[in-house]
């Protein structure tokens, strides 16, 4: 198995564990109760050829064990928002990045910008989960098979 395949298998196993606690049907219903998604298109399209910035809340990376200073992801997102990004990306993958859906909740509650959930999405469950936690956008990896949403 490649390292990417291992990461995908880990992401699937983690999603399956969460699904055993909160069934897909209940999560799907929760995702429908979230206020409408904020469109990122207006902020991504610029007429002045300026670079569009997507700020990222991330606790760690595979290279750096700890990105100190992310004690409050919501507060960090507020600082980012003051700089005028088009969106805020929140790394939610718990494995090597120490992200979480709680980080997504905190950022969603803190800013009125489009919020992107950044995780290795391998199941439809994760799509509904991200939306239920307030994500407006979702990062999908082109190396994975297309998801069929249920």
Language model features with spans:
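Conserved N-terminal beta1-alpha1 strand-loop-helix module at the mouth
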Residues: 1-115
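Structural loop-to-beta junction motif characteristic of Rossmann-like glycosyltransferase folds
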Residues: 113, 135-136
């Amino acid at each position: 198995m490649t390292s990417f395949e291992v990461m995908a298998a880990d992401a699937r196993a983690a999603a399956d564990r969460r699904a055993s606690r909160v069934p897909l049907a209940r999560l799907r219903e929760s995702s429908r109760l979230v206020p409408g998604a904020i469109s990122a298109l207006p902020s991504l399209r610029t007429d002045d050829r300026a670079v569009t910035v997507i700020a990222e809340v991330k606790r760690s990376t595979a290279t750096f064990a700890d990105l100190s200073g992310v004690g409050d992801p919501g507060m960090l997102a507020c600082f980012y928002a003051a700089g005028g990004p088009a969106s805020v990306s929140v790394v939610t993958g718990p494995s090597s990045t120490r992200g979480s859906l709680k980080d997504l909740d905190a950022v969603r509650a803190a800013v009125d910008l489009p919020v992107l959930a950044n995780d290795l999405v391998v199941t439809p469950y994760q799509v509904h989960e991200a939306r239920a936690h307030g994500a407006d956008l979702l990062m999908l990896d082109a190396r994975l098979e297309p998801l069929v949403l249920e």
